[in-house]
């Protein structure tokens, strides 16, 4: 473990909390010290859930370590069952509680409770959040659905004639990126195909619902990071086929419809005929051409990163210049996707490595997590969030799915708008020194109310006073500012910039300004120039343009 200001995934017990909180009738008792009790903060402040998470803590203190901490856990478990009346109880330790080795599973079973007790062995120092969520969901599914599983080798009974096919939607959890909205979009899409949804799990499911998973005709894997382990067990135990195409983007949604139709034996035409797409007409318009070929850097969980890479290249006409994930369990899939794009995949959970890769790639747009939003803001690059972990603004009150045809429309808005607003911002930056548009100029439509004490020279074109934003460059979005562009600091012995060249550099769009600065400094250094003038800037542009 290491000390850091940011982590893409929490310890595995956070994944268990996400599953327990997403479900009904499940409670999770965690053997943990006082400092590990952060579930309320995660689920009520960030996700803005209306109720408290289904998590209880032993909350032992330092003075308790010399006493019987096992008794504390048994008391906490018994109290949680008496108070919350769950249908199933999850028990486990936090990363700190794991060190005292009290065996929560054995202690809970010794209580002789009348409900299923599911012990979670989550190695906090080897695994992380998504693995913990997948393992918790698998343990729940196997415990609740296992008794109904047929004997090995038993053929699956055919669906009764006249009965609509039924499926399970597996993978959505609490604190997931747009999981609630994705479920709504996919349920509606399946309904248009004549397919009923038997169970959605873990989100909104109860232990009794998990016991019915084997009754469905097939399973739909919405989020492999969470559902894959459980789905593989359901395939073996019940002989259920699985639909694994994740319907993010237009092409993937059509492929998803085709796969569901093949598995369920239904006609895909109704779902394809009711496409609610607004993307194709815009893609054929003249306005779309100036976004073609934009350079995009993508980082997130494997499911969303791979889907974003496909959508960016095949549907938006973008050029993917970087692709990575923090989910090492899916490194193989991401490397295959990156290799098809001629890239080397970035597999890391260190945000500093991601920041360095983004700075080196000089993208026009960053698609990532909450941390990439911060990185892009610091580098002066437009950004859109496509993956967890996210903050409160990515749990909107409105419906904003990522999956299905409606999700494709949301992707279009989310990805294109930052680029278009970036162009507008560039125009504002270009003209900010103009006598009519500088920071201290009064709005032109309020000229009748202009203060009388201003110098008449302003109206005849005398140079205005330095705008306030130039006095504090670190607070601007100008890529030439020291804290907005990591290349701004000139190393010792490097050519210095003349004021006129700095002013001309600010006319370069902010999303390529850092690259223009570095290329110009390299051009000047190779020719032994002590200073960089406007002529040097344009000579460097011509040189690298060739």
UniProtKB/Swiss-Prot annotation:
E.C. no: 1.3.7.7
Keywords from the named record: 4Fe-4S, ATP-binding, Bacteriochlorophyll biosynthesis, Chlorophyll biosynthesis, Iron, Iron-sulfur, Metal-binding, Nucleotide-binding, Oxidoreductase, Photosynthesis
Coiled coil: none
Enzyme class: oxidoreductase
Sites where the protein binds substrate: 422-423
Start and end residues of each stretch annotated as Disordered: 443-501
Gene Ontology BP annotations: light-independent bacteriochlorophyll biosynthetic process; photosynthesis, dark reaction
Cofactor annotation comment: Binds 1 [4Fe-4S] cluster per heterodimer. The cluster is bound at the heterodimer interface by residues from both subunits.
Catalytic reactions of this protein: chlorophyllide a + oxidized 2[4Fe-4S]-[ferredoxin] + 2 ADP + 2 phosphate = protochlorophyllide a + reduced 2[4Fe-4S]-[ferredoxin] + 2 ATP + 2 H2O
MF annotations from Gene Ontology: 4 iron, 4 sulfur cluster binding; ATP binding; metal ion binding; oxidoreductase activity, acting on iron-sulfur proteins as donors; oxidoreductase activity, acting on the CH-CH group of donors, iron-sulfur protein as acceptor
Residues the record marks as active site: 287 (proton donor)
Domain of life of the organism encoding this protein: Bacteria
Task of the protein: Component of the dark-operative protochlorophyllide reductase (DPOR) that uses Mg-ATP and reduced ferredoxin to reduce ring D of protochlorophyllide (Pchlide) to form chlorophyllide a (Chlide). This reaction is light-independent. The NB-protein (BchN-BchB) is the catalytic component of the complex.
Membership in a protein family: Belongs to the ChlB/BchB/BchZ family.
Subunit structure: Protochlorophyllide reductase is composed of three subunits; BchL, BchN and BchB. Forms a heterotetramer of two BchB and two BchN subunits.
Alphabetized HAMAP family for the sequence: ChlB_BchB
Protein name in UniProt: Light-independent protochlorophyllide reductase subunit B
Biological source species: Rhodospirillum rubrum (strain ATCC 11170 / ATH 1.1.1 / DSM 467 / LMG 4362 / NCIMB 8255 / S1)
């Amino acid at each position: 473990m290491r000390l850091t200001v940011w982590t893409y995934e929490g310890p595995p017990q956070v994944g268990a909390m996400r599953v327990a909180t997403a479900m009904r009738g499940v409670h999770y008792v965690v053997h943990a010290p006082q400092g590990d009790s952060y579930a309320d903060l995660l689920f009520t402040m960030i996700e803005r859930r209306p109720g408290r998470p289904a998590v209880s803590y032993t909350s032992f203190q330092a003075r308790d370590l010399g006493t019987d901490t096992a008794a504390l856990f048994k008391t906490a478990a018994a109290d949680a069952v008496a108070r919350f009346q769950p249908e199933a109880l999850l028990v486990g330790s936090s990363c700190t509680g794991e060190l005292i080795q009290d065996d929560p599973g054995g202690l809970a079973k010794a209580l002789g409770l009348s409900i299923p007790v599911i012990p979670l062995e989550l190695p906090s120092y080897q695994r992380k959040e998504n693995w913990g969520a997948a393992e918790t969901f698998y343990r729940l599914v196997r415990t609740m659905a296992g008794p109904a599983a047929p004997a090995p080798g038993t053929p699956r009974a055919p669906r009764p004639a006249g009965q609509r096919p039924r499926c399970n939607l597996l993978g959505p959890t609490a604190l997931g990126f747009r999981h609630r909205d994705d479920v709504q979009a996919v349920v509606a899409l399946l309904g248009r195909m004549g397919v009923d949804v038997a169970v959605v799990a873990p989100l909104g499911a109860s232990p009794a619902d998990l016991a019915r998973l084997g009754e469905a005709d097939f399973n739909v894997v919405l989020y492999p990071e969470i559902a894959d382990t459980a789905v593989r067990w359901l395939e073996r135990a019940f002989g259920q086929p699985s639909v694994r195409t994740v319907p993010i983007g237009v092409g993937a949604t059509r492929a998803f419809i085709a796969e569901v139709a093949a598995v369920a034996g239904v006609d895909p035409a109704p779902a394809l005929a009711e496409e609610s797409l607004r993307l194709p007409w815009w893609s054929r318009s003249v306005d779309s051409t100036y976004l073609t070929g934009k350079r995009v850097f993508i980082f997130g969980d494997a499911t969303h990163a791979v889907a974003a890479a496909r959508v960016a290249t095949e549907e938006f006409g973008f050029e993917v210049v970087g692709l990575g994930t923090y989910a090492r369990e899916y490194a193989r899939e991401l490397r295959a996707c990156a290799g098809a794009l001629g890239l080397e995949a970035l597999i890391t959970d260190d945000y500093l490595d991601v920041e360095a890769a983004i700075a080196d790639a000089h993208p026009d747009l960053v698609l990532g997590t909450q941390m990439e939003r911060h990185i892009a803001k610091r580098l002066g690059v437009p950004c859109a969030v496509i993956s967890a972990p996210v903050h409160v603004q990515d749990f909107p009150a409105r419906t904003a799915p990522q999956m299905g045809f409606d999700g494709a429309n949301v992707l279009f808005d989310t990805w294109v708008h930052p680029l278009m607003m970036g162009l507008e911002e560039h125009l504002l930056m270009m003209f900010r020194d103009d006598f009519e548009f500088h920071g201290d100029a009064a709005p032109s439509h309020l000229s009748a109310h202009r203060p009388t004490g201003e110098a008449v020279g302003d109206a005849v074109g005398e140079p205005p006073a330095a705008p306030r934003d130039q006095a504090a460059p670190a607070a601007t979005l100008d890529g030439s500012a020291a804290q907005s562009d990591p290349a701004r600091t000139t190393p010792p012995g490097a050519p210095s910039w003349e004021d006129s060249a700095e002013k001309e550099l600010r006319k370069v769009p902010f999303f390529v300004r850092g690259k223009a600065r570095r290329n110009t400094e390299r051009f000047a250094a190779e020719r032994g120039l002590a200073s960089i003038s406007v002529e040097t800037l344009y000579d460097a542009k011509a040189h690298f343009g060739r």
